[in-house]
Design a protein with these regions (language model features):
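A basic- and aromatic-enriched beta-loop-alpha substructure that forms the phosphate/nucleotide-
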Residues: 64-104
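Conserved substrate/cofactor phosphate-moiety recognition/catalytic segment
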Residues: 25-64
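Conserved lysine of the Walker
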Residues: 16
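Hydrophobic anchor at the beta1->P-loop junction of P-loop NTPases
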Residues: 8
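A glycine- and Lys/Arg-enriched "phosphate-lid" helix/loop adjacent to the NTP-binding pocket
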Residues: 89-161
Length: 161
């Protein structure tokens, strides 16, 4: 077993990356950030969720698996920005409930997720950041990521429920 690791969870714009940065500086933890800017499907996903949900979520599942493996094998203490569990248990479930992800893609994703989940160790501590949807919208606008500006309020709300 590697060193202990902490994970930060929360909705889009809740302040996860900010807290990860603070914890890493304050306590000397190595930060592992969510690969938001690396996702080649993200801009397309926010333009047409139905067409790009599956590919975008598979991208995140793959990258988060790699981050979990890195965190588990680290000899130093690590703080992880978003977990593999949130992607599957919150994002994919919200996409299914909103009928953005069809049954076939949902089942395929869940099957892959369950295999991966059996191979990773849960974080030693999980911190959840809560923020109102109004606050999330303000922070997203302030942050200024072009791909996030058109996130539907209903989608953010479904991720918070």
């Amino acid at each position: 077993m590697g060193a202990r690791y902490v994970a930060i969870a929360g909705n889009i714009g809740a302040g996860k990356s900010t807290l990860v940065g603070f914890l890493s500086k304050r306590f000397g933890l190595r930060p592992l950030y969510e690969p938001v800017d690396d996702n080649p499907y993200l801009n397309d996903f926010y333009k047409d969720m139905h067409a790009h949900a599956f590919a975008s979520q598979i991208f995140y599942l793959t990258r988060k698996f790699a981050l979990h493996i890195e965190a588990e094998g680290a000899s130093d203490k690590v703080v992880l920005d978003r977990t593999i569990y949130e992607d599957a248990e919150i994002f994919v479930e919200a996409l299914k409930a909103r009928r953005v992800l069809n049954r076939r893609d949902y089942r395929t994703y869940r099957e892959l997720y369950e295999v991966i989940r059996s191979q990773v160790r849960a974080p030693d501590l999980l911190v959840y950041l809560h923020c109102s949807v109004r606050g999330l919208k303000r922070r997203i606008q302030w942050r200024g990521r072009a791909s996030e500006q058109a996130i539907p309020t209903g989608y953010l709300r479904s991720l918070s429920n």
